[in-house]
Amino acid sequence: MLFDYYCDLNLKNITSVKYRHLFLLLFWPVYLTLFVLTEKYVTPIYNVYSPMDDFIPFCELFVIPYVLWYAFLAFVSIYTLFFDIPSFKKFYTFLCVTSVITFAIYILFPNMQNLRPDTFVRDNILVDVMKNLYEVDTNTNVCPSIHVVFSIGMLFTLWNSKHFSSALWRTVSVVITISICLATVFLKQHSVIDIFAGVGLSVAIFPFVFLKEKNKCKKM
């Protein structure tokens, strides 16, 4: 059953080995606090831009995978929490480490981008959604892209989970991840530099989180 593993969870045993992974969920209030503080108090200095950005048109269709990121994040978090706790631990360790590095970059290298269109060629519901996103999600603290980093973290998690080892699941996860990464530049939320930075950070942290246990087994 879905909740069998947590059926005897209470305040007295929440710190036990069986349940202490739940404290990783404290990542979210800490993350959101850092997000709000950096948005409010960090003044951007460096403009992130690449000539490649000029060749990428705005395309509102990418709102779909961009918003899908939130559902993808919720799915991986909830599924691993209940059905694959080792993967949950790795995923949230990845989120914690990469977020600390990302926010440190935002503070030490306060950045922004000026890629958003002033006007929109088309007028439809997807453009309206994007206008609302622009109001909520500012054009500051963009490099590296958290959308990209978290998406790749989800991809690593699924690919390293026995529950998602089929070719179908792996293909779907790759397609979703690539679509989300492309959405960040086609919606003018990020520069291509932000993608490269996000990929670089994710790949650099990958072996320390996802290959740690495998390397220990080989040594034994």
Feature map (PLM): residue ranges:
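N-terminal transmembrane-helix/juxtamembrane module of multi-pass inner/ER membrane proteins
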Residues: 1-74, 118-121, 130
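Membrane-helix interfacial "entry" motifs
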Residues: 12-20, 55-59, 82, 86-87, ...
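Alpha-helical transmembrane segments of integral membrane proteins
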Residues: 19-27, 89-97, 168-173, 193
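Hydrophobic faces of alpha-helical transmembrane segments in multi-pass integral membrane proteins
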Residues: 26, 30, 34, 93, ...
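Aromatic-anchored segments of alpha-helical transmembrane domains
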Residues: 32-34, 99-108, 175-186
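Membrane-interface loops
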Residues: 39-52, 81-164
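Residues within membrane-spanning alpha-helices of integral membrane proteins
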Residues: 63, 70-73, 96, 100, ...
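Membrane-embedded catalytic cores of phosphoryl/pyrophosphoryl-handling enzymes
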Residues: 131-220
